[in-house]
Structures are given as structure tokens and as C-alpha cells.
Regions:
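Multi-pass membrane proteins that catalyze or facilitate reactions on polyprenyl-/lipid-phosphate substrates
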Residues: 1-255
Length: 255
């Protein structure tokens, strides 16, 4: 029963927080601290991310199909994904990221990058994906995405921040974040599956399937309703939430 509860909590947390600007890693680590899940199984972690990957790919299947026909847009998505892929592989290979994954680090980054998100959201909108997602903008957003390798920053959050600084509207900023999540989550999933094979770890078990399924459902719903939310409201709610979460994380550390 405890394992089922862990699977449900991790899946929901991953699904909900992966695509909104609040840092999924901070939430998963806080969850682990609260419930004593000190060592989340690799298969659960990989399955949760894989479920999110399938959800975002399915949700944007039409856009992805259009991208494959539009070589220029497809090329720009690739360009924006190269920095995090190259640097991320190096940092993961030499376990540099794991050394940064502390509640203290995530507390501070959650607050600092939450404030950056607030500042960026004040920029006036002048650009959209159709006309302004240039090679230059793709490179800049790709460089912003590298910062997501620092635990607590939030991949979705930092891409939206970068896009808003470049004066993309909120909806398109979120869409850029979602589309760039596909190669990022795909790369992470492949690396995770490779690790599972290398460790000869048991996979494709009931727990893995349940994790991926729940993560898919909650990821899909989050993407759908986050876009609905952005049509009416700004990002202040998420900024406030990040500040509160960061304070809670630091409170846990320094208490």
C-alpha cells in the first residue's frame, strides 16, 4: 500500500508541476522529505517523466506534424534544444547535478527565479511564434533552458521567463516551453531507460505502467488548463506560489 501511495503522489506531482513554472524537482524532493521517500526508484522516476513526454506529444500532435513539414521551425526547435542536451549530458555523466540537488539550493533558486519570472511578465507583448521565433531567439531561449539544469529553477519557468523577456505573449511563451519539453523529456527518458538496462533493473512492471499512466493523465490536464488560465490571467499566481514554496524549503533546511 505504501508503494502504491508513493507511485500516486510522485505521478501526480510530476504530472502537475512539469509543465507549469514551479519546478517539479523541488516538489518531488520536498515530497520525498515529508513522506520519507529518500530514494525514489529509478523506474518510477523514468516512468513519470515518460508519461509526461507522451502527454505533451499527444496534446501538440497537430503542431508537431506541422513542425515536421516546416523545416525552418523544426530546425529552430533543434537549435534551442542543443545547449541543454550537450551540457546536461556532461553534468549528469559526472554527477554534478546530483551534488546540487539539495533543499537549500532549491529553496533559493525557487525564490530567485520566481522573481525573475515576475519581472519578465511585465514586458509588453510584441512577438509570436509564427513570425518571431527566429534563429537568434531560439539560441537565446536555448541558453535560458540550460539554467533549468540547476535544481529548483524549473525548465518550464525559465523558458517562459526567457520568452517573456523576448516579448513573446504568455500563450506562445508557454507553447515554446511545451514544445521544447519534448526533446528534453525524450532525452531524459532515453538516458533513464539506458540506465535501467545497464543496471538490469526490473521494468515494465505494474508500478511503472501505473506511474506512466497517472503522469500522462495529470500532465495532459495540466497543459490544457494552464493554457486556458493564461488566456485570462498573468503569471503572478505562480510567482507568489514559488515565493511561498521557496520559503517553506528554506524553513525545512534551517529549522
Amino acid at each position: 500500500m505504501e508503494n502504491i501511495l508513493q507511485i500516486v503522489l510522485i505521478s501526480i506531482t510530476q504530472g502537475v508541476t512539469e509543465f507549469i513554472p514551479v519546478s517539479s524537482s523541488a516538489h518531488v524532493n520536498l515530497l520525498s522529505k515529508i513522506f520519507g521517500y529518500e530514494d525514489i526508484e529509478l523506474i518510477i522516476n523514468v516512468s513519470a517523466h515518460f508519461g509526461s513526454l507522451i502527454a505533451v506529444t499527444f496534446f501538440f500532435r497537430r503542431e508537431i506534424f506541422e513542425f515536421t513539414k516546416n523545416k525552418h521551425l523544426f530546425f529552430k526547435v533543434v537549435i534551442a534544444s542543443v545547449p541543454i542536451g550537450a551540457i546536461g549530458f556532461f553534468l549528469i555523466k559526472y554527477e554534478i547535478i546530483s551534488n546540487l540537488r539539495t533543499l537549500e539550493m532549491m529553496g533559493w533558486t525557487t525564490i530567485i527565479f520566481g522573481l525573475l519570472l515576475y519581472i519578465s511578465d511585465k514586458f509588453q507583448t510584441k512577438q509570436d511564434i509564427e513570425n518571431s521565433f527566429t534563429v537568434k531567439n531560439a539560441i537565446v531561449i536555448g541558453c535560458f533552458q540550460v539554467l533549468a539544469l540547476v535544481p529548483g529553477v524549473s525548465r518550464s519557468g525559465i523558458i517562459i521567463t526567457g520568452a517573456r523577456f523576448l516579448k513573446f505573449n504568455r500563450i506562445d511563451s508557454a507553447k515554446i516551453s511545451f514544445l521544447l519539453s519534448i526533446p528534453a523529456l525524450g532525452g531524459w527518458s532515453l538516458y533513464g531507460f539506458y540506465d535501467l538496462i545497464k543496471q538490469n533493473d526490473g521494468w515494465l512492471n505494474t508500478g511503472a505502467v501505473l506511474t506512466a499512466f497517472l503522469s500522462f493523465i495529470f500532465s495532459y490536464l495540466t497543459i490544457k488548463y494552464f493554457l486556458v488560465y493564461l488566456k485570462k490571467f498573468n503569471l503572478s499566481l505562480f510567482v507568489g506560489y514559488r515565493l511561498i514554496l521557496g520559503i517553506i524549503l528554506l524553513f525545512v533546511v534551517y529549522l
